[in-house]
Each structure stands twice: as C-alpha cells, then as structure tokens.
Amino acid sequence: MSGLIRCRQGAFYIDGKNVKQQKLSDYVYFVMQEADHQLYTDSVTEELRLGNKRIPSIDEKVSQILKMLHLENFKDCHPYALSGGQKQRLTIGAAMLSEKPIIVLDEPTSGLDWDNMCAVANAVNYMREAGKLVFIITHDLEFISLTASRALLLKEGIIKDDLQMTEQNNFKIVKNFMVEEGGE
C-alpha cells in the first residue's frame, strides 16, 4: 500500500483517482515497526521539523506533538539516545506532521506501557480527526478498541472478517483473535 513492495496486479485509487504505484509515496506515510530506519537528524525536535519547515506555526505544532507523545523532556536529545518506545513515538509524531492523507502504522504499540499506548491512541485519533486515513497493522486488541472504527481480520494475507467497531463486534474480534492464536 505504501509502494515499498511492487504490486503485481490491481490498481490504486485515492479520492477516486487512479494513482500509479510509483506515486503512492506522495500520498502514504509509512511508520515502520523498527523506528531506527526512519530517523535522520541530530535532535528530536529537528526530526519532527524535517520536511515540515514550511508548515505555518511549525514550532507550536512540534511542541504540541512532543507533549502529546510524552517526549517534551527529550526535545534536544539525539534520536538514537532514545529508548525503542520513544523512537517509535517520535516516528508517529513525524507522521502526524506529514501532509500526506494516508498513514500506515506497523505495530505502533509494540513494547509500550499503558500510558504510552494511550498517548499513541490519542495521536491516532488526532490524525483521524484531522481527516487522515489511518491504517494500523497490529496484534494489540486494546489499542484497536481505542482507535479503530473498522477492523479487518487477516489470515495468511486474506481478509477473514470485516467488522465495524462496536461493542458487539469488539467481543467478536477478541473471540476470533483468541481462537486463531489459540489454535482452536
């Protein structure tokens, strides 16, 4: 979906327009599970400003995101001095500032404690409210229940179930997940 792997068949449509695979990166921001592959600058603040300096009131937005993701005390630190979870939240912060309409998050809560998982959930909801389409690849059911409006359950790359997130379907999702993981 983000264009990293060549698709052999099918077409991509965004806002009703056919988009060539080579142009997907113009529309999609992909946050990798391994954050080290997406960090390029010498400070947390500069990482968030990278490519976004023309955004009006960028400094104010950077401060807001640092606070939202519990990174304000690390704003001057080198990204490689951060813990894995802090790096993960930093790359999500960069996605928040991106002007791309589609965000893909790969396992955005792996290794996070409850407070930081909730901070990432707030960031996802912030992006959704800003009009971004957010795809989340995860095994974290608590996180999905806090962020998703729809869940696609996949097995071996095939959609097994497509559910609107409601209290009734939350139970079905948990049950399906437990059955699949438990091997019933």
Question: What are these model-derived regions, one by one?
Answer:
Residues 158-181:
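Conserved beta-strand-loop-alpha-helix hinge in the C-terminal portion
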Residues 144-146:
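A short, surface-exposed alpha-helical micro-motif characterized by mixed small hydrophobic
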Residues 103-106:
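Catalytic Walker B motif of ABC-type/P-loop ATPase nucleotide-binding domains
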Residues 57-74:
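Conserved ABC ATPase "signature" region
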Residues 78-82:
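Conserved ABC ATPase signature
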Residues 138-139:
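H-loop/switch region of ABC-family ATPase nucleotide-binding domains
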Residues 10-24:
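Conserved ABC transporter NBD signature motif
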